[in-house]
Regions:
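N-terminal glycine-rich dinucleotide-binding loop that anchors FAD/FMN and/or NAD(P) in oxidoreductases
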Residues: 46-70, 235-250, 311-317
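Conserved phosphate-binding loops in N-terminal lobes of ATP-dependent enzymes
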Residues: 72-75, 101
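Flavin (primarily FAD) cofactor-binding/catalytic cores of flavoenzymes
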Residues: 1-37, 42-43, 84-245, 254-427
Length: 427
């Protein structure tokens, strides 16, 4: 009997189970370890707020490599009014994508039972992975399981400020259960501060606006930049995989020269044009150039790569014009309670708000994840240039955990490939 352990049951864990079940091999047992019940979509795709929308067009959001229209077909069948409105190039609400993931999972569970797939869902957190002759997992309740293969499909958590701060008016984790009241019953005539000005901040701003918010919003981030508008791809044939051998500086100069000579394009189109070869470019950079990119260019990449729907950005821009939204550039040095207010201190000023929301992105420091830290201490994982990599032939990483190896690996198109690759190794 071969035992496969899946740790984590978000998008990657669910789609991995679906593919393993569909291609089930006899004498295989699948163990799924997650604190969340298997039929529930993750918080990021739940109904916390119907205003939160995907940042990728519907036509690119199928969970399956071999069924490219699967999500679009789901929309057309179960949300026909929305489908008529947005079409394949539109952006669906996140909670509807959560419904889609639940839908395909439920169908897979029915099929798995019909095929007598041997699987078990264990509602426990894995706190230790070790090897004593065989690979084994220890759970928070002390139970241990010996397994043959381990797939780490754990999700990223949200980054936090480097100092402690607590307040009933501080949303520390945007996707936690404790944030439900803020999402569903937001304060409508207060001053709200946002830590960060990326896609999560845009989500919160739009949700407040659609809830008839009449107060003021102050977004604070290191660079003070908002996401750019999404666009229909223009034909740009500039960067080749072979260019990677010349290094990051060469690529920057090549792009700068092109944009100077072709003012009808901007950096979004150039970055969009290398979408399908980003991983190959990253694989062909040496360690020196990877570190140079991460040190000097990653913030600009994030601004121009991670775009928001045009309607969303225009609504945010109108709020800035109307004075309802202010975006400030600065590093936060301290946050403290001052009476009923929250004081945010940057290098240049003190900002007072009534409520504060953490809109920072993912946490990429491996030592902030208990299980990853433990596995590194056991030498089952190794630190790489961003996160971690496997140091054991029977431990496989899925999705965003491969960011150091692949760089571009957190969007659904890359996640599907990652899942397919791991399935090929397991079967």
């Amino acid at each position: 009997m071969k035992t496969i352990a899946i740790i984590g049951f978000g998008f990657c864990g669910k789609t991995l189970f679906i593919k393993l079940s569909k291609n089930y091999q006899p004498k295989t047992k699948i163990l799924i370890f997650s604190k969340s019940h298997y039929s529930l979509s993750s918080a990021a795709f739940s109904e916390l707020s119907p205003s939160y929308i995907l940042n990728v067009p519907a036509k690119k959001m199928s969970a399956f490599l071999d069924r490219e229209n699967d999500f679009c077909d789901f929309l057309e069948k179960y949300h026909s009014t929305l489908w008529t409105e947005i079409g394949e190039n539109g952006f669906a609400p996140r909670y509807i994508y959560g419904q889609y993931i639940d839908y395909i999972l439920e169908a897979a569970l029915v099929e798995a039972k019909e095929k007598a797939v041997d699987f078990e869902f264990i509602n426990q957190e894995v706190v230790r992975v070790f090897e004593e002759g065989e690979l084994a997992l220890e759970l928070e309740n002390g139970d241990c399981y010996e397994v043959d293969d381990i797939v780490l499909a754990t999700s990223f958590k949200q980054a936090q400020m480097p100092f402690e701060f607590n307040s009933k008016n501080f949303v520390k984790d945007l996707w936690s259960e404790t944030s439900i009241n803020f999402h569903q019953n937001p304060p409508l005539n207060k001053t709200i501060g946002l830590i960060g000005s990326g896609l999560s901040a845009v989500d919160v701003i739009l949700s407040l606006k659609k809830n008839k918010f009449i107060g003021n919003i102050i977004a604070i981030s290191r660079h003070g930049n908002l996401p750019k508008k999404s666009f229909l791809s223009a034909k740009v044939d500039l960067i080749k995989v072979a260019d990677a051998k010349n290094g990051v500086l060469f690529l920057c100069l090549k792009i700068r020269k092109f944009l100077r000579e072709n003012p009808q394009f901007d950096l979004r189109q150039v970055i969009g044009s290398i979408r399908n070869i980003t991983q190959e470019l990253w694989h062909n950079f040496d360690e020196k150039n990877k570190q140079l990119f991460l040190r000097r260019l990653i913030s600009y990449w994030n601004i121009f790569r991670h775009c928001a729907p045009i309607d969303s950005v225009e609504m945010v821009e109108n709020m800035i014009i109307d004075g309802q939204l202010v975006v400030k550039k600065g590093s936060i040095e301290n946050i403290e309670n001052v009476g009923e207010k929250i004081s945010i201190t940057t290098k240049n000023e003190e900002i007072l708000v009534d409520h504060l929301v953490n809109c920072l992105g993912f946490e990429f420091r491996a030592d902030k994840y208990r299980l990853l830290s433990q596995m590194m201490s056991e030498q089952l994982l190794k630190k790489d240039c961003i996160m971690v990599k496997s140091n054991h032939p029977k431990i496989h990483l899925l999705g965003g955990l491969n960011i150091g190896r692949d760089f571009e690996c957190t969007a659904v198109p890359e996640l599907r490939l990652s899942v397919s690759d791991v399935v090929g190794k397991l079967l």
